[in-house]
Amino acid sequence: MIPTQDVSWTDIESLIEKLSENILKLSRNFSSITTLSRGGLVPSRLLADSLGIKKIFVDQNTISSDSLFVDDIFDSGKTFDNIFSCVDNPSKFIFATLFARRDIQYPEQLIYGEKTLDNSYVVFPWDKLEFKNSIQ
């Protein structure tokens, strides 16, 4: 069986609060949030509400540097690498996640709520069914 780190909605609310505080410390005004469909959708909406950001863009070919990019987890770095080339000004790009995988190197653009406990698969409340179906 695959070891998991199960995350509750209460955990998510705490992480959103912590991540919002970390983002506000940057003293940046983000005009929007950009995300990828699936994993980033729920955290994007919650962060948008918390930060008062009205626009959320999904699956964009170009990412504005004044848009906060949001995903659920920084894991292998593959998502970051894929979208980084789409950013109009990489020096101003911020990549925000609820979790960052423990014991890996992070890009300087990453801001996160907390590190994972270990290398277990993180199961978010919105993907429990997907995970369950994937192991059957």
What is each PLM-predicted segment?
Residues 1-136:
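PRPP-associated nucleotide enzymes
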